[in-house]
């Protein structure tokens, strides 16, 4: 792994106007990171990654890199782009456990964060480093939101979320699981209890219906509901998945792991929105594809 990422870093052209950085939604300074890696300045590279994006250890695994940083790499026009996701993952994974928590001067203000998904975790870490006393309110028993309950283990190890939780606790962030805001506790109660600000990061958990006949039948499930608790669903041996996005690939691969013998993905047209490597994995694991 280490030799691989060094080889990849050495391929970086250090473009004056790096398109890879422009292709990243949060503008990760990719040429700078690759150069620091080549200079054996691993911790410095990790510090820059986490300052830019505290969720670097997650994004380097689950982001759609081929449409973002790697998809914009100029080397990809004639050959293969730099595999920056592997570089970032190696650095951020190494840095996460070794990151030293700085001495933070508290400003005396309390902030409530509702929801512990990627947005909630990012905001909590940023605010804690800025001196705020942060409390996260999470309605489920574990933090992570969609990272915990929507992305399968084979795509994102849940141990990464546990490591984030440990680091957050070291930062003094308080986590209150199994706490629903909006029933017994409302936002007004939080302000009454001394919180100066409230961040709402509850995510988008409600699936979107497609409006076709039979959609409400008992053996028809939304992908997000299935991925949350696949062991609670009895799909049978023959499963149809409507859609060609990354969620559809996750559903198909999960179904095969939970006893389905035949899984077929259906699309209305010829377009596949899932990343090419997720499609490849899904095909390798035995799923079939049917296009309209």
Residue ranges and their predicted role:
Residues 105, 110-114, 162-212:
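Feature captures the FAD/FMN-dependent oxidoreductase FAD-binding
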Residues 10, 17, 112-137, 176-188, ...:
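Rossmann-like dinucleotide/flavin-binding elements
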Residues 92-98, 178-181, 219-227:
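Short gly/ser/thr-rich secondary-structure transition/capping motifs
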Residues 133-136, 140-171, 175, 252-292:
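Rossmann-like dinucleotide-binding cores of NAD(P)H-dependent redox enzymes
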Residues 1-110, 158, 200-217, 287, ...:
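Ferredoxin-type iron-sulfur electron-transfer modules and their immediate structural context
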Residues 198-201, 222, 241-242:
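Redox-cofactor binding/interface segments in oxidoreductases and associated redox assembly factors
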